[in-house]
């Protein structure tokens, strides 16, 4: 396995570990999710160019579009939650009431 692929897999794993550990604030969870999506985007782009699968060249762009949509929805939820509850603590939220 190439060192760049190993570094990207390690970056994804660290971002996933960040989601699992730092889940007290919604903002830190959203930042870790963005790190995961960015490492997936770069890894997918490198693998497509390495294996010459140019028919799949739109897949990283679609992933990037979904990542931007996820960030927008996440920030909208963050604003809504922080205005209604006064903080962004995840453990104090019941998402069925929001």
UniProtKB/Swiss-Prot annotation:
Signal peptide: none annotated. Its EC number is 7.1.1.2. It comes from the Eukaryota. The chain crosses the membrane at residues 1-21, 28-48, 59-79. One of its GO terms (cellular component) is mitochondrial inner membrane. Pfam families: Oxidored_q2 (PF00420). It is found in: Mitochondrion inner membrane. InterPro entries: NADH_UbQ_OxRdtase_chain4L/K, NUOK/Mnh_C1-like. It is a multi-pass membrane protein. GO terms for molecular function: NADH dehydrogenase (ubiquinone) activity. It catalyses: a ubiquinone + NADH + 5 H(+)(in) = a ubiquinol + NAD(+) + 4 H(+)(out). GO terms for biological process: ATP synthesis coupled electron transport. Core subunit of respiratory chain NADH dehydrogenase (Complex I) which is composed of 45 different subunits. Belongs to the complex I subunit 4L family. Core subunit of the mitochondrial membrane respiratory chain NADH dehydrogenase (Complex I) which catalyzes electron transfer from NADH through the respiratory chain, using ubiquinone as an electron acceptor. Part of the enzyme membrane arm which is embedded in the lipid bilayer and involved in proton translocation. This is NADH-ubiquinone oxidoreductase chain 4L. It comes from Isoodon macrourus (Short-nosed bandicoot).
């Amino acid at each position: 396995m190439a060192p760049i692929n190993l570094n990207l897999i390690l970056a994804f794993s660290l971002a996933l570990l960040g989601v699992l550990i730092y889940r007290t604030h919604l903002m830190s969870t959203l930042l870790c999710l963005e790190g995961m999506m960015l490492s997936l985007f770069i890894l997918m782009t490198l693998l497509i160019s390495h294996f010459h699968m140019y028919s799949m060249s739109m897949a990283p762009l679609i992933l990037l579009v979904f990542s931007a949509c996820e960030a927008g929805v996440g920030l909208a939820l963050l604003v809504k939650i922080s205005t209604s509850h006064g903080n962004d603590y995840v453990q104090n939220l019941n998402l069925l009431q929001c």
